[in-house]
UniProtKB/Swiss-Prot annotation:
The RecF protein is involved in DNA metabolism; it is required for DNA replication and normal SOS inducibility. RecF binds preferentially to single-stranded, linear DNA. It also seems to bind ATP. InterPro entries: DNA-binding_RecF, DNA-binding_RecF_CS, P-loop_NTPase, RecF/RecN/SMC_N, RecF_2. PROSITE patterns: RECF_1, RECF_2. This is DNA replication and repair protein RecF.
Length: 357
């Protein structure tokens, strides 16, 4: 399994100078609100995907009165440790380096550093629009299906061109010129998503049974256009409305994966704590499927685990994570709220300083 052997963070949020050696399995960061616990997890997340899970404004990540931040790790890849780091300045320039070389794409970091992130807002999986749920499925395909990323990139280009043509109200021939490419890649992407959902659902049911046995949720995959028509037929049917609205209404960019309980949306029935457990079940199943398909376990980032969960549920989460055999970074206020296994390291975070205990 991949794991982070060392972590250095400079001038990222309130973390002025952090240099720690995480445990290869459990790591628990505790401290008061605002101490910097979540920022530790956020820095790892940023290094993997090039963005924050807390803000869309990257300039807020740079510590006050400084002009740049640096995040650096050594990552064990199964055979050796490789260096991976990023520097970003207040002008927006950033440099990602992997194994001593400048990386041309952030997908290279994401591939080497697979993360399952469970933040305080993860329950939004059920509440937010379809985009977050598509991203959940696409994360899996990015890591397990070699052809996915190129298909996804081509689809985005075709969709962007078609939408621009619709918005500009170009002649019909120039609009429909993009349909063939959009349909080819759209149908392939749909098939990949459908296959991954079929493999994912039994694992999700298995995980959910551990947390909420009385709530047999059912997952429903919607491909993004009517089951009555092919994608090409749907584009032709929708063309007049697409022209009026200036964008493509049907296609895999509209896909969704919804959860229901007794034919009702899960979010209408479950409490916030229960929604949090559903999200945990989703991400643990995601990690299990990745391991089944590739032999690689993701690193888990679990922010504020104790919140909204009683002691029994907290213990259940820890026991399940322990079975996943992955490196885990967990945050919370009180270390006594978590029953950590022997193979773990406890870190105290105070005013942006981090110390192993």
């Amino acid at each position: 399994m991949p794991y982070i052997g060392s972590l250095k963070v400079n001038q990222f949020r309130n973390l002025a100078d952090v240099d720690i050696t995480p445990h290869s399995q459990f790591n628990f960061f505790f401290g008061q609100n605002g101490a910097g616990k979540t920022s530790i997890l956020e820095s790892i997340y940023y290094l993997s995907v090039g963005r924050s899970f807390r803000t869309h404004l990257p300039q807020r990540l740079i510590q006050d009165n400084t002009d740049r931040f640096l995040i650096f790790i050594t990552l064990y890849n199964g055979t050796q440790f490789i260096p991976l780091g990023v520097e970003r300045d207040c002008q927006g320039d950033r440099c990602l380096r992997i194994n001593g070389e400048t990386a041309s794409s952030w997908s290279l970091a994401a591939k080497r550093l697979p993360l399952c992130s469970l933040s305080a807002m993860s329950h939004r999986f059920l509440l937010d629009g379809p985009r977050v749920r598509r991203q959940f499925l696409d994360w899996l395909m990015f890591h397990v299906e070699p052809s996915f990323f190129s298909i996804w990139q081509r689809l985005q280009r075709s969709l962007k061109q078609r939408n621009a043509s619709l918005k500009a109200k170009l002649p019909l021939g120039e609009i429909t010129h993009w349909d063939k490419m959009l349909v080819e890649d759209g149908e392939r992407l749909h098939q990949l998503r459908q296959n991954i959902v079929t493999e994912f659902k039994p694992l999700f049911t298995q995980m959910l049974q551990q947390f909420l046995p009385a709530y047999p949720l059912i997952g429903h995959y919607f491909r993004g256009w009517s089951e009555k028509y092919s994608l090409m037929e749907q584009l032709q049917i929708n063309l007049k409305q697409d022209l009026q609205r200036g964008y493509t209404q049907a296609g895999p960019q509209r896909a969704d994966f919804r959860l229901t309980l007794r034919d009702l949306p899960a979010q209408d029935i479950l409490s916030q704590g229960q929604q949090k457990l559903v999200t945990y079940a989703l991400h643990f199943a995601q990690g299990l499927l990745l391991k089944e398909k590739t032999g690689i376990s993701p690193i888990y980032l679990i922010d504020d685990l104790p919140a909204e969960l009683d002691a029994n549920k907290r213990d259940c989460v820890i026991d399940l994570v322990n079975c996943l055999e992955s490196q885990v970074f967990i945050s919370g206020i009180d270390p006594n709220e978590i029953r950590l296994p022997p193979h773990s390291t406890l870190f105290h975070v105070k005013h942006g300083k981090v110390a192993a205990l």
